[in-house]
Amino acid sequence: YYPDFAAKLTHLVYAINKSHAFNDGNKRTSIMAGVYFLLLNGWEAERAAHFAVSMEDIAVDVAANHIGKETLAILIMFVLSV
């Protein structure tokens, strides 16, 4: 159970990034799944694009284990608030 929108988005991005479901493209897929989730939930395309750009370096750090899920949640909340 994820109590709020940001928690759901965080889990979606983190789970896809860390699952290694694909040989290549897990980070890109996690970002684009997040963008799609934003769009499905009524966010404007411009805001979703901002999310995608902002998440590029963050996704790399998540994959490299430099950022955990809790820190990712904080960063996502910040990105959504800007």
Task: Tell what function each PLM region has.
Residues 1-82:
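FIC/Doc superfamily catalytic core
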